A protein has these predicted regions:
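Adenine nucleotide-associated cytosolic modules
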Residues: 1-251
Length: 251
């Protein structure tokens, strides 16, 4: 009988669909990259989600985040993402945590999680996620930097220790090596970062418009990278694709 996953079933078969529907994916960071990871997963058939993000949707998110519209400005990203998931698949199960994940955060992960997505932008949080994933023996894929870039064709999937060019990947290599982490699947760009234009009138440092109640306002960041619609979205969909392929290939 035809259903919303019929076209996908033609590609991966009934068993593949069943694997995706039974899979549980934890996504940390539901922004420019993470929101498209969610989109790719739910439309493919993944039916169980954990979403973690403390942020609220800001006007400046409209240029790249699929959950950002004029109607969702000021709303928690995890709640908007949950609503979108359920609009696509009403049978999905979605746990949300509106919090900023850090080493002292409570344990959210357990052995029911089949895959972890790191799409956060803080090195400390990224490292902690990898460490926890390794301890729990849960597959994880990590997004490296997608800001200050214009060429989505430069993204590659590889191990962290085979990366180059990306400044974030360089820091991650050092920190993971110091912790004895042997491998990490990542999506990164070989494009040299573009230096952002400086415009005091267009600066989040001096003209912050973060929604009321935002805990980590952009005005406190050392640098706010430039971004565009077609770069982080591609990284997110690549990540979704890697997860889906890994899940359906499992014995």
């Amino acid at each position: 009988m035809l259903n919303q996953f019929s076209r996908t079933e033609l590609l991966i078969g009934k068993e593949g669909i069943e694997k995706l529907q039974n899979a549980k994916v934890a996504i940390f960071g539901v922004g420019g990259v993470g929101s498209f990871v969610v989109e790719g997963l739910v439309r493919a058939g993944v039916s169980n989600f954990i979403l973690v993000d403390d942020d609220k949707i800001c006007l400046t998110n409209l240029n790249r985040q699929i959950i950002a519209t004029r109607k969702t400005i000021g709303k928690p990203k995890v709640e908007v993402a949950k609503e979108r998931i359920l609009e696509i698949n009403p049978n999905a199960n979605v746990e949300v945590y509106q919090e900023f994940f850090m080493p002292d955060s409570k344990e959210i992960l357990d052995d029911t999680v089949d895959y972890i997505v790191d799409s956060v932008d803080t090195v400390t949080a990224k490292i902690e996620l990898v460490v926890r994933a390794n301890k729990l023996n849960i597959p994880i894929i990590s997004s490296m930097g997608t800001g200050n870039k214009l060429d989505p064709t430069k993204f590659e999937v590889t191990d962290i220790y085979k990366t180059s060019v990306c400044p974030l990947a360089k820091v991650m290599r050092k920190e993971l090596r110091n912790r004895g982490i042997k491998k990490l699947k990542v999506v990164y760009s070989k494009e040299e970062p573009i230096r952002p234009y400086e415009n005091i009138e267009n600066s989040c440092k001096t003209n912050c418009i973060c929604p009321p109640g935002t805990k980590r306002k952009c005005s406190i960041r050392n640098q706010v990278p430039g971004s565009i619609s077609f770069v982080p979205s591609v990284a997110g969909l690549i990540i979704a694709g890697e997860i889906i392929k890994d899940i359906i290939r499992e014995d």
